[in-house]
């Protein structure tokens, strides 16, 4: 019984630490309705908001909800996303952001009644790539790995087998705002939930190489 109580206490402590970590993050464009419960972020996405710069459409917008922490160096970030998508371009997922002109957002985007794995990469101007899903997915895991000057973006339906959806440039040796974003450019908003958000530090590959090369000095 004591072991069981100790195990439960440890689990409760871990959940508390994770919840506190989520609570300590920051809003950029805070939505009117949001909540954190059981280490999950829920929000009603602000209507007619988005992140996009110039290309194809000729406008720049930077006004969608984004809940983030700031990280330097190399890392892996992932999250489980579930959305009640309703209107064209309703979207949610991860965002890695240096500033208004340099960011990557990746997740699910609802277009013409279809669910798409979507990535937007912005360096002064935005580009957009999609992978259409054959059928709606109740949830998707999105993962991004930042190594040196590149970010690899992956998706998964079970948090076990991941498939790459994009490899994109992101400036090296620069702090990055990392977190969860959602937007409803053409709609009236929707309910979005983010679960199991985590960021794992990855040792700097160049430092490890230097240490290996200079081990005997």
Question: Where would I find each of the regions flagged by the language model?
Answer:
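Bacterial Sec-dependent N-terminal signal peptides
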Residues: 1-21
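Extracellular glycan-recognition regions
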Residues: 20-217
């Amino acid at each position: 019984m004591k072991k069981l109580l100790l195990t439960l206490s440890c689990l409760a402590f871990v959940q508390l630490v994770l919840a506190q970590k989520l609570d300590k993050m920051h809003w950029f464009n805070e939505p009117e309705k949001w909540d954190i419960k059981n280490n999950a972020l829920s929000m009603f996405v602000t209507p007619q908001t988005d992140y996009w710069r110039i290309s194809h459409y000729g406008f720049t917008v930077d006004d969608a909800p984004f809940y983030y922490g700031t990280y330097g160096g190399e890392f892996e970030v992932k999250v489980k996303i579930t959305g009640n998508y309703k209107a064209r371009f309703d979207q949610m997922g991860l965002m890695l952001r240096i500033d208004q002109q340099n960011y990557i957002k990746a997740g699910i985007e609802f277009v013409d009644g279809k669910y798409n794995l979507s990535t937007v990469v912005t360096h002064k101007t935005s580009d957009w790539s999609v992978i259409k899903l054959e059928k709606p997915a109740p949830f998707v895991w999105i993962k991004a790995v930042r190594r040196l000057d590149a970010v690899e973006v992956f998706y998964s339906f079970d948090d076990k087998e991941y498939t790459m959806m994009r490899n994109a440039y992101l400036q090296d040796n620069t702090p990055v705002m990392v977190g969860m974003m959602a937007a409803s450019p053409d709609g009236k908003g929707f309910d979005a939930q983010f679960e199991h958000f985590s960021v794992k530090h990855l040792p700097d590959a160049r430092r490890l190489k230097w240490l290996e090369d200079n081990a005997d000095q």
